[in-house]
């Protein structure tokens, strides 16, 4: 082959390599789904930061927004969508951050399926602890106090751990070393417990996520009945996370059991609600799940570093 021909071949190879490199650089970023509601959006961003996909402005603290992402370490794009659609759309994303409220009904178990689990302290102040909320004027209501006391018992703690398989954790003191009375063999007896509201004081509690995510309130009802408290818990289900606070503010329900401390502060500030925490309930850690990849490293490899 003459020198001119060799030069042509070399130029062609160089051009092909350049085109390949350009194509790689121009490849569409892998999509990472996060909840689009305020508090969980922040949690999702923080979890993706912990996974090493992005860097976030430290000044944003626990509540970063998309604009606070300062660097994408890999060729990824963070995409907020409705939290309740994240499980059903998991296949459309490289990975998504999903909390237990929506993961449980979809059959996702953190210890089995999650690529990364949000780390949360089970004691002390935590902005993502779920709480029971009352109108501030009712914070000393004795009936409501009894409901919280019944929830924060060993039976309910055991039920949370056994029934939800590490998706929910108690956010109140309990004896971790005790021989649990609640087991896989009898947990269904508690979730299937039936009570009557005849002759009892009815307390309406707002929840989201369907019955399967709120069976701990059935365990709480059993505790109340065993104590002869004459209190009946009526769960009022809402389709959207922002509705229970409005309902309790309007007097349509008595308590709200579906929100974190961080969201409560934000929602009260935005809407002028006079609500307060009367008890901690559970911790539902956010997790990274994927149908396409079996590890965080596999996602990073597919995305490519930037």
PLM region descriptions:
Residues 27, 92, 106-120, 266-278, ...:
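Ligand-binding "clamshell"
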Residues 28-33, 198-211, 231-237, 306:
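Short, well-ordered beta-strand elements
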Residues 127-146, 285-299:
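A bilobed periplasmic-binding-protein/Venus flytrap-type ligand-binding module shared by bacterial periplasmic
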């Amino acid at each position: 082959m003459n020198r001119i021909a060799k030069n042509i071949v070399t130029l062609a190879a160089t051009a092909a390599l350049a085109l390949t490199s350009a194509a790689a650089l121009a490849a569409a970023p892998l999509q990472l789904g996060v909840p689009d509601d305020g508090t969980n959006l922040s949690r999702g961003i923080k979890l993706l930061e912990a996974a090493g996909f992005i860097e976030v402005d430290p000044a944003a603290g626990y509540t970063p927004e998309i604009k606070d992402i300062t660097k994408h370490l890999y060729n990824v794009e963070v995409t907020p969508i409705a939290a309740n659609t994240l499980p059903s759309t998991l296949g459309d994303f490289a990975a998504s951050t999903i909390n237990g409220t929506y993961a449980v009904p979809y059959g996702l178990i953190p210890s089995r399926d999650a690529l990364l689990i949000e780390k949360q302290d089970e004691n002390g102040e935590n902005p993502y602890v779920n709480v029971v909320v009352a109108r501030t004027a009712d914070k000393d209501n004795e009936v409501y106090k009894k409901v919280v006391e019944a929830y924060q018992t060993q039976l309910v703690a055991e039920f949370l751990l056994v029934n939800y398989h590490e998706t929910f954790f108690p956010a109140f003191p309990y004896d971790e070393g005790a021989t649990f009375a609640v087991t896989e063999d009898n947990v269904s007896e508690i979730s299937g417990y039936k009570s009557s509201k005849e002759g009892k004081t009815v307390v309406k509690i707002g929840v989201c996520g369907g019955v399967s995510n709120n069976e701990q309130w059935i365990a709480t009802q059993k505790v109340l009945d065993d104590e002869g408290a004459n209190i009946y818990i009526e769960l009022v289900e809402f389709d959207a996370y922002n509705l229970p606070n409005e309902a309790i503010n309007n007097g349509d329900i008595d308590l709200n059991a579906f929100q974190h401390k961080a969201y409560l502060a934000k929602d009260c500030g935005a809407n002028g609600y006079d609500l307060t925490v009367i008890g901690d309930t559970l911790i539902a850690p956010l997790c990274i799940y994927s149908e396409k990849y079996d590890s965080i490293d596999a996602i990073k490899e597919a995305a490519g570093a930037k």
